[in-house]
Curated annotation (Swiss-Prot):
Gene3D superfamilies, per database record: 3.10.20.30, Nucleotide-binding domain of ferredoxin-NADP reductase (FNR) module, Translation factors
Protein name: Propane 2-monooxygenase, reductase component
UniProt-listed Enzyme Commission number(s): 1.18.1.-
Cofactor, how bound (note): Binds 1 2Fe-2S cluster.
Binding partners and assembly: The propane 2-monooxygenase multicomponent enzyme system is composed of an electron transfer component and a monooxygenase component interacting with the effector protein MimD. The electron transfer component is composed of a reductase (MimB), and the monooxygenase component is formed by a large subunit (MimA) and a small subunit (MimC).
Taxonomic superkingdom: Bacteria
Uppermost EC category: oxidoreductase
Domain 2Fe-2S ferredoxin-type: 5-95
Domain (FAD-binding FR-type) ranges: 105-206
Gene: mimB
Induction: By acetone. Transcriptionally activated by MimR.
Family of the protein in this entry: Belongs to the bacterial ring-hydroxylating dioxygenase ferredoxin reductase family.
Lineage of origin: Bacteria, Bacillati, Actinomycetota, Actinomycetes, Mycobacteriales
Keywords, alphabetical: 2Fe-2S, FAD, Flavoprotein, Iron, Iron-sulfur, Metal-binding, Oxidoreductase
Length: 348
């Protein structure tokens, strides 16, 4: 049995136990404490914290998420950190409402309902929760899907909302050599079982916030944003919302009719498809299409973006460009929420 130590989190005054053979983030989940996090693989810095006292060692993390100078100062990524003594840790990023009020992590056995291509490289995977018969999550969160016959998993965002209790939809981008996405080419069949673990992530609408919502997405980043929009439509959320979706061509667009329909129940909703290669091609007449990178289109329309809350989700180059744009336009960091769908070495 691995040795166990006490972790005290400041400034929230929460204490928990952690074993030496588990990382601090997983130990928190196990005890119902929901710390801020993103990728859970040492790549995004969402769980970056500061060690005030104690011995902690990190493993297998990206220096882009926590560089050597930061490590020397005492910064750590909780998803990669193991404690070898009692520790006091300062949380740099936390949501007091979520800390002890998040949704518990669940292990769910699911059955495949449908595998449907949406574009040349985006596939909709719809699963039915079987045991238990319902999967609880917050719109915008993600889950781990376990690769059948292996100990491995891949993480994907839900596109549905909890109100659709009989199925969960994922939008998955196919990558060459991707261990999970390769299964979508005929290897996963209707009726197959897939194990799911979750929910994870902090890419959620914040209760009580009133600023307009600006969503910027690309690729499979459609999934969590679609979940947020579906939730806003279902609940009659009174916040204005705009959605900018970046793609290469019109052939890479999907769910356009549903987005327009959702927008009818969202205050002052606007949707603009941003096409980086060509604005030619057939799209529904009510869809606004502009040529250019998604950040350039946003810049043309959002002169007061510092007075909004921004939700970003998509491939890393798009997210990085958008973060740079938001920083240049003085958008406060606590008004920016993002998921970056990484890869090359972490294939899908």
């Amino acid at each position: 049995m691995a040795d166990s130590h006490k972790i005290n989190f400041e400034p929230v005054d929460i204490e928990m136990d952690v074993r030496e053979d588990e990382n601090i983030l997983d130990a928190a989940f196990r005890q119902g404490i929901h710390l801020m996090h993103g990728c859970r693989e040492g790549r995004c810095s969402a769980c970056k914290s500061y060690v005030l006292d104690g011995e902690i060692q990190m493993e297998n993390y990206s220096t882009f998420a926590c560089n050597d100078a930061e490590v020397d100062e005492g910064f750590v990524l909780l998803c990669r950190s193991h404690a070898f003594s009692d520790c006091t840790i300062e949380l740099l990023n936390f949501d007091e409402d979520e800390l002890l009020g998040g949704i518990p992590i669940q292990d769910v056995r699911t059955e495949v309902l449908a595998v449907e291509p949406k574009t040349r490289d985006i596939v909709s995977l719809r699963l039915k929760p079987v045991e238990p018969g319902k999967f609880d999550f917050k719109p915008g969160q993600y889950a781990d899907l376990h690769i059948p016959g292996t100990e491995e998993h891949r993480s994907f965002s839900m596109a549905t909302t909890p109100s659709c209790s009989d199925e969960v939809e994922f939008l998955i981008k196919k990558y060459p050599g991707g261990k999970f996405s390769a299964l979508l080419d005929g290897h996963i069949q209707v009726g197959d079982e897939i194990a799911l673990t979750g929910p994870y992530g902090s890419f959620t609408l914040k209760d009580g916030h009133v600023l307009p919502v600006v969503c910027i997405g690309g690729g499979a980043g459609m999934a969590p944003i679609l979940s947020l929009l579906r939730h806003m439509n279902e609940t009659g959320n009174g916040r204005p919302a705009r959605f900018y979706y970046g793609a290469r061509t019109a052939a890479d667009l999907f769910y356009l009719d549903e987005i327009l329909e959702l927008g009818k129940g969202i205050k002052d909703f606007q949707f603009i498809a941003c096409l980086s290669e060509s604005a030619e091609g057939q799209v529904p007449g009510a869809v606004a299409v502009e040529e250019g990178m998604v950040t350039d289109v946003v810049a043309r329309h959002e002169s007061a973006i510092a007075k909004t809350e921004v939700y970003l989700c998509g491939p890393p180059p798009m997210v990085d460009a958008a973060l740079g744009f938001l920083d240049a336009n003085s958008v406060p960091k606590d008004q920016v929420f993002y998921d970056s769908f990484t890869s090359p070495i972490f294939d899908q």
